[in-house]
C-alpha cells in the first residue's frame, strides 16, 4: 500500500495492545482461563513487534499516544510497564460498559487524551478494531501482522493497511 505522510492530519494515535503492539499469543490460553497470576509470570514469553517500542517513543514526541484494549486494566498496565512502552493514556476493558466493536472504548480514550475524533487514528489487528474506529468517527489502520489475516482486516475497509510496524514511520514521522 502506498503511504502518504499524515503528520499534520492527526494529533493523537491510538493503538490496540494485544497482537498489535505486543505479541501475547503465548498467554492466550491462560488468559481465557483467567489464570492471571500465571499470566503475569509469563510476560517474558511476550514480545513487542518489530521496532514498535522505538517507534512509539518517537511518535510520543510529536503526538499524544494511547492504548485502547479489551483486556483488563491491571493486565494491560502491567504488560505496558513490563515492555516499557511510551504511551500517554490507557483505556481498558473496565473503563467502559460496552466494548469493541462498540465505539465507547475509543471515545473514552479520546476524552482522556483531550482530543477529537477527527484528530485521531486507531490502529488495530482485528475487524472489530476497524468497526469500532468507524463507529467512533476516527480513521482506522489495520495492522496485518496481528491475529487476523490481511484478507479479514481488509474486508472491514480500514482507511490504511499497514504491512509492517515500520509503515508507522512512513505515515507519521
Task: List each language-model region with its residue ranges.
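Short, acidic loop-to-helix structural element flanking the phosphoryl-transfer center
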Residues: 40-67, 77, 81, 103
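Active-site neighborhood of HAD-like aspartate-dependent phosphohydrolases
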Residues: 1-48
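Acidic, Mg2+-coordinating phosphoryl-transfer loop and its flanking beta/alpha structural elements
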Residues: 121-161
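A short, structured active-site edge motif that brings together acidic residues
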Residues: 86-100
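Conserved Lys-Pro-Asp/Glu-containing loop-to-beta segment of HAD-superfamily phosphomonoesterases
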Residues: 12, 103-130
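Conserved phosphate-coupling serine/threonine residues in phosphotransfer and NTP-handling enzymes
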Residues: 20, 69-71
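Surface-exposed amphipathic alpha-helices with a cationic face
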Residues: 53-61, 110, 130-134
Amino acid at each position: 500500500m502506498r503511504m502518504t505522510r499524515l503528520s499534520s492530519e492527526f494529533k493523537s494515535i491510538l493503538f490496540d495492545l494485544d497482537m498489535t503492539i505486543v505479541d501475547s499469543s503465548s498467554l492466550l490460553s491462560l488468559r481465557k482461563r483467567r489464570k492471571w497470576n500465571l499470566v503475569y509470570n509469563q510476560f517474558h514469553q511476550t514480545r513487542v513487534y518489530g521496532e514498535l517500542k522505538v517507534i512509539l517513543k518517537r511518535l510520543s514526541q510529536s503526538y499524544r499516544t494511547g492504548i485502547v484494549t479489551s483486556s483488563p486494566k491491571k493486565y494491560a498496565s502491567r504488560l505496558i510497564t513490563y515492555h516499557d512502552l511510551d504511551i500517554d493514556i490507557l483505556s481498558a476493558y473496565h473503563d467502559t460498559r460496552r466494548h469493541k466493536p462498540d465505539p465507547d472504548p475509543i471515545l473514552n480514550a479520546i476524552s482522556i487524551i483531550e482530543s477529537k475524533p477527527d484528530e485521531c487514528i486507531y490502529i488495530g489487528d482485528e475487524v472489530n478494531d476497524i468497526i469500532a474506529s468507524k463507529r467512533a468517527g476516527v480513521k482506522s489502520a489495520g495492522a496485518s501482522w496481528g491475529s487476523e489475516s490481511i484478507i479479514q482486516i481488509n474486508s472491514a475497509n480500514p482507511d490504511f493497511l499497514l504491512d509492517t510496524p515500520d509503515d508507522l514511520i512512513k505515515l507519521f514521522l
